[in-house]
Amino acid sequence: MAQQTNVAGQKTEKQRKAPFRADHVGSLLRSVPVKEARQKKAAGEMTAEQLRDIENQEITRIVEKQKEIGLDVVTDGEFRRSWWHYDFLEGLDGVEPFIPAEGIQFHNTKTKARSIKVTGKLDFTSHPALGDYQFLHEIAGNATPKLTIPSPNMLFFGEKADKGIYDDQEEYFHDMAQAYKKAIKAFYDAGCRYLQLDDTSWSLFFEDKGREVVRALGGDPETLPAIFAKTINDAVADRPDDLTITMHICRGNFRSTWAASGGYDAVAETILDGLNLDGLFLEYDDDRSGNFDPLRFVKRKDLQIVLGLITSKYGELENPEDVKRRINEAARFVSLDQLCLSPQCGFASTEEGNLLTEEQQWAKLRHVIDIANDVWR
């Protein structure tokens, strides 16, 4: 890596591999053509092939837009998904869609009702996301295509269809890890070199309300974090050296609202010194996220911390000097060379999207790039 001097006069390295100094979590506001096409498909007025053609056109457009504004990383915006997690999880062997009595509770609102049910042995034999990634790979050009998928830990929240299906929790987590190990290999063979696991499960340990949810699901909030970490580490254990795997740790993101609050403190050591990943995307866009003290648990020099200091929930641009000041605060705990910048979450974790315009979305991403260029120049 070539050395450069940043605005504070410190020597930093130009980031040539993922995660990048200016990165983003992945999901983007669904375009009007995609929304209209999905509605027509649901109404029986459009075939699956016609819908895919429109998705392909719009994904190509947003990939070009990401490159045009200066990003080194591109995603498909999750344009083929309704949810950031359910669509992918339903494609695993042994998992089926399920409509519960009500949606997920967020701050002052609820999502539409949707969940998953585990009906048999978990496995990964084939998956529609493979074709989705291959399309992104083909159109990425000289940018790095990033695939975003839910963490295996999200399967913990799936209902069991019948008694007798995974009564043994150890077997359940073992099979989660093995299914994901196969998935990682399949995506690698398809050309993927930058994979992101999205995970809201950790936020349950940030506050008492979440820990009660864990207990209601039959888990122990004292021991479950270590089990979650082992599952992740087992899943990624055999990854090739040239595959970058990061994790985005999220507190919920639905129509500009949130589901959880609290800092990382209760599980900071497990997350920051216990996960064998290449990078962590951490939300830090408001007071609900806590302070930077947990970053003291970052012991590895090869772990990149992507600071989510730019909110994806609203269109107003942050004061760049305030963002730079916060990056410098984080650098008290972690070397500036190990830090990157991104929005705190995606712009549309579900197809409804957050409450900002597409132009505001692109302005936010340009803002990330401009600030990163100033800090790590």
Curated annotation (Swiss-Prot):
Domain of life: Bacteria
Annotated region (Disordered), positions in chain: 1-25
GO molecular function: 5-methyltetrahydropteroyltriglutamate-homocysteine S-methyltransferase activity; zinc ion binding
Bias kind Basic and acidic residues: ranges: 11-24
SUPFAM superfamilies assigned: UROD/MetE-like
Segments passing through the bilayer: none
The family this protein is said to belong to: To B.subtilis YxjG.
PANTHER family: METHIONINE SYNTHASE
Protein name according to UniProt: Uncharacterized protein YxjH
Gene name of this polypeptide: yxjH
